[in-house]
Amino acid sequence: MLMATAVPVANSKPDVDRLKSILPGVPLVESPFFDDILPTCDFDAETARVGRDLHEKGFAVVRFPDEEFDARAERIKNRLAPRFDFAGWRENGWKVNDGLRVQDAWTFDADVRAIAVNARILQILEKLYGRKAWPFQTLNFPVGTQQHYHSDSVHFSSIPERFMCGVWVALEDIGDDAGPLEYYPGSHKWPIVYNDQVGVRIAGAKRRASQELYHQVWEALVEKTHLAPEYFSPRKGDALIWAANLLHGGSCQRNPNATRWSQVTHYFFENCCYVTPMASDMFVGKLQLRRLVNIADGKQVPNVYVDAPYASLGISFRFREFLATMRRSLSPIARKIRH
C-alpha cells in the first residue's frame, strides 16, 4: 500500500484584498481579519492604535481633538446647569441610583453640536468602520448615571449589525467617588442578544420590553467568563470610544455632592438600516425602524439594506401587514383547517 507523504505547507501571506472584500457587511474594526488587514491600511499611528484597542478590548481612550474644548466644556456646563434639579436629585434620585440628563441638546446648543460633529473623530471612525460615520444623538450628564451595565445594541442597532458606536467625553476632571464610567473589556465580542433569545415577543405582548429583561443574561455572562470591570476616572477632555456591543454603565456615585459632567454622542454609519431591537421582532417581519437626522447636516438619513434604499424594496416590516399578506396567500381549504 502506498502511504501518503505529508508535504509541509509554507507559511503564506494572507490575501488581504480578498479578506477586505468577503465581509462588506462587517465593520473593519470588528472583522475577524482585522489584524491581517490593518498593516496594509494607510492609517496614521493614532488611528491604528485606536483600531487595535477597539478590536481587542472594545474601547479606546483618546484626548478629544478640539483646541477650544476647555472653553466649550465650560459654556456647556453653564448653559445646561439651570435645567437640573440638583437638590432634588441629592435628596431622592441619588439614593435610588437614578441620574440626570439632557437628550439632544445639540438642537439648541452649538457647543454640544460641535463636539458631536468633530471632524477628527468622524475621520477616525470612518477609517476604522469602513463607512462614513454620522452622529444621531447626544446625551449630557451633570452627575453619574449609576446605570446597570448594558449593551447599546438592545436600544439602537444597525442591519448589518455593529455599525454603531459611542464616544463619551469628560467635561471636567472626574474622581473615583463621582460614579465613573464602568465597562467590561472584551465583552463586545459576545453575540448580540435579541428579544426572542430571552423569550420576549413584541407582537401581541401585554408589556413592553425593557433593558431589565437582559440584565440576568449579561450578569451570567460576566460571571461565566470571570470578566472584571474597569473604571474610567478621566481628566477633562479625555474621551472613550466604545464598540456597539461593549457592556458599559455608570458605577455607584459615592459622593452625591460631586458632579460628573460629561457628553455622550452616539454614531451610526451610512448604508444601513437603523433599528430599535428591544422594540422589534427582528426575524419575523416587525422592525421598529428609526428615522434619524444626521446632526452634522440636519438631514434625515435613509434606511438602506445591502446597497438598496429600504423604501425601494417593497418590503413591509410591519408585523400586522406581514400576517395579512400571509393570510391572503392561504387557500380556502388551508384557512378552513386553520380555523
Task: Kindly give the residue locations of the regions a language model identified.
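Non-heme Fe(II)/2-oxoglutarate
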Residues: 4-40, 86-89, 197-199, 236-241, ...
